[in-house]
């Protein structure tokens, strides 16, 4: 649904036994053939996008997502001179609601050990994301964006790590863009993640200078200041230089990379800890 100044969308899905691989003995994200997009928001800010990203569970899940986007009227006390954009998002993923069968006594040998009640939420919650993003242009040079994210993350299910507590995290982001002069802009991010589980609290700072339309240089530092083990309260600094041209981005980075799961477009992979140079090329077709 959409009309001037407001728009909304709702997505609901239910999948069961969609683990289609080139080698059926593999697991996690290895050798997947079919693409199963997650019905969750694809966050772009570092802490929300890289610490606890969600990927669809191919063995079965029920997922839903609701988006609401509205723009407050410009030249008003509540909308400001240029108007204010507000985006709300809610996403949820649950296990399947199933009815179990005893295969030994079942005369139908082709029947599975359970039947699925499609689109009904099972007892086990896999993931939940509630977030709001507010964007306001203050003047011709200054734009501010603020975000709040509340996450629930079932680490045992999503990452296959047994004995881990469910993650309950709050994330806040402040993004400030200032145009110094034509084709030159500086952007600063301040991010915080607070949780009592897993590795504890994180902070991230980003500063980026752009020479439009092609070049940019950036510095980012992640700090795991809330880790329960003082030996792991580490900084992860990284500097980057990039060039954009005709839908292609070439970027060279140097710094410390923490271990974890990184997702791009719903495709996730495990990345080991490293310290060194990285060269990446991203193309849009």
Which residues fall in each region the model found?
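Exposed, low-structure sequence patches enriched in small/polar residues
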Residues: 1-285
